[in-house]
């Protein structure tokens, strides 16, 4: 598969075919005054002078220190990752269909699947989904197909699930006869009270969805909920932050028999924050369910000459083979993001991932402890969390967040829209990129803002 750039005569021929006189004409819908002009750079300057000039221009942009999490996280991305990803051999987001010409790309995906299966403790992984929310929706559909014992298409979900995931799940399953029951959140401890599950004991469920760490950063009672679900004939779908699995037990170890399907958002591993995407969703499962798994799966094989190679496998599940009977409409994967994640995990290794996760947890704990020393400010829950905590404030949280922006800090995620009991609460997140100085500046800015708005 060639990635050689087009020659001028090839470009001219293509433009002639579509009736365009130039490449600029293809973008004529963009007003001229909005188009980027030539950079104004002095002639004859050396690289150091050029770098200094561009740095001064870049400093005109104002960058707040970010303490927002809520599903998208600021982690350090080693420079080598995107330098490699941007190479012509990798720089495509599409699935490598032509196995004999795509061995390198297929091997990257195979390595990704191996790493994700190891991280989650599952037997198999697909090549990725669009994002964490769609990965959950596909996991629910997969569980319904796979659980032959269930007589209904009902799913039990803990309210502490990420609200965006829930909305996407409802949208995708809206016309498929799938029903959801919600186990209400205990606003006193930020997670599902396992005793409330008995209210649903007489209902037949195909699956139970558990997010841990949940949307509020709390670690769910995964053992109790998993055992309850299996006792009542339901499969367990685990939604998790892959970074947390570097220091927490894997979903395969939840309860007596472990989760059946694991999914989530892969953005924390080498993918930058970029106005909501592109990210990638991951999905792994036990071998018993692999034939119901949606999306691409890369397998290792041997050719006619006995040489080891890679190919797309179990394709009879997919739309281009089964049409309407396929496991899913998805016929691709987030290949470019997966490449970044694979290189990220390879560069850091198990010890590196553990360090990132541990420092993130330590910094979050330190930030919460320092904030709790201020009058009227408290960490809402006393449970163990990973890298996010809910902070109660003595003032309206939405106003507080707005005022903190003026101090150069994105203070956290306003929770009032999520739960009526949390109007004066924000969720803050710290990772390995936050320094002691960053945390100190957050505390000083909080003091200043609370004094200004009456806290």
Swiss-Prot record:
EC number(s) recorded for this UniProt protein: 1.4.4.2
Any GO BP annotation: nucleoside metabolic process
One Pfam match: GDC-P
Record bears the keyword Oxidoreductase: yes
Protein keywords: Oxidoreductase
Disulfide pairings: none
Catalyzed chemical reaction(s): N(6)-[(R)-lipoyl]-L-lysyl-[glycine-cleavage complex H protein] + glycine + H(+) = N(6)-[(R)-S(8)-aminomethyldihydrolipoyl]-L-lysyl-[glycine-cleavage complex H protein] + CO2
Enzyme class: oxidoreductase
InterPro entries the UniProt entry points to: GcvPA (IPR023010), GDC-P_N (IPR049315), GDC_P (IPR020581), PyrdxlP-dep_Trfase (IPR015424), PyrdxlP-dep_Trfase_major (IPR015421), PyrdxlP-dep_Trfase_small (IPR015422)
Source organism superkingdom: Bacteria
GO molecular function, one term: glycine dehydrogenase (decarboxylating) activity
Subunit-level organization: The glycine cleavage system is composed of four proteins: P, T, L and H. In this organism, the P 'protein' is a heterodimer of two subunits.
Record-stated family: Belongs to the GcvP family. N-terminal subunit subfamily.
Job of this protein: The glycine cleavage system catalyzes the degradation of glycine. The P protein binds the alpha-amino group of glycine through its pyridoxal phosphate cofactor; CO(2) is released and the remaining methylamine moiety is then transferred to the lipoamide cofactor of the H protein.
NCBIfam families: PRK00451.1
Protein known as: Probable glycine dehydrogenase (decarboxylating) subunit 1
């Amino acid at each position: 598969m060639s990635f050689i750039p087009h020659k001028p005569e090839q470009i001219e021929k293509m433009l002639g075919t579509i009736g365009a006189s130039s490449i600029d004409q293809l973008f004529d819908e963009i007003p001229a005054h909005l188009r980027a002009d030539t950079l104004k750079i002095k002639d004859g300057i050396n690289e150091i002078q050029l770098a200094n000039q561009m740095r001064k221009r870049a400093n005109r942009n104002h960058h707040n220190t970010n303490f927002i999490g809520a599903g998208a996280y600021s982690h350090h991305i080693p420079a080598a990752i995107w330098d490699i990803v941007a190479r012509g051999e990798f720089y495509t987001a599409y699935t490598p269909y032509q196995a004999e010409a795509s061995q390198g790309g297929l091997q990257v995906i195979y390595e990704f699947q191996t790493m994700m299966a190891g991280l989650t403790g599952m037997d198999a992984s697909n090549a990725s989904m669009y994002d964490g929310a769609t990965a959950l929706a596909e996991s629910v559909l997969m569980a319904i197909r796979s659980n032959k014992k269930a007589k209904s298409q009902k799913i039990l979900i803990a309210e502490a699930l990420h609200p965006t995931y829930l909305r996407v799940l409802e949208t995708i399953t809206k016309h498929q006869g799938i029903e959801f029951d919600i186990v209400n959140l205990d606003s006193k401890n930020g997670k599902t009270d396992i005793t409330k599950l008995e209210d649903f004991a007489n209902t037949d469920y195909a699956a139970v969805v558990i997010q841990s760490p949940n949307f509020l950063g709390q670690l769910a009672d995964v053992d109790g909920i998993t055992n309850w679900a299996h006792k009542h004939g339901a499969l367990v779908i685990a939604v998790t932050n892959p970074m947390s699995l570097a220091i927490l037990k894997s979903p395969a170890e939840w309860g007596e028999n472990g989760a059946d399907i694991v999914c989530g958002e892969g953005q924390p591993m080498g993918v930058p924050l970029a106005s909501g995407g592109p990210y990638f969703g991951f999905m792994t499962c036990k071998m018993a369910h692999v034939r119901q798994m949606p999306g691409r799966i890369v397998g290792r094989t041997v050719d006619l000459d006995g040489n080891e190679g890679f190919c797309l496998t179990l394709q009879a599940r997919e739309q281009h083979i089964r049409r309407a009977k396929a496991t899913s409409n998805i016929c691709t994967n987030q290949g470019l993001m997966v490449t970044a994640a694979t290189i990220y995990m390879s560069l850091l290794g198990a010890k590196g991932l553990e360090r990132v996760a541990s420092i993130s947890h330590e910094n979050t704990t330190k930030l919460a402890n320092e904030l709790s020393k201020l009058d009227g400010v408290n960490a809402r829950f006393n449970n163990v969390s990973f890298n996010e905590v809910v902070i109660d404030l003595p003032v309206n949280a939405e106003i507080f967040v707005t005022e903190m922006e003026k101090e150069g800090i994105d203070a956290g995620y306003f929770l009032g829209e999520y739960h009526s009991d949390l109007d004066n609460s924000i969720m803050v997140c710290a990772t390995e990129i936050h320094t002691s100085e960053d945390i100190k500046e957050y505390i000083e800015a909080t003091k200043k803002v609370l004094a200004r708005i009456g806290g």
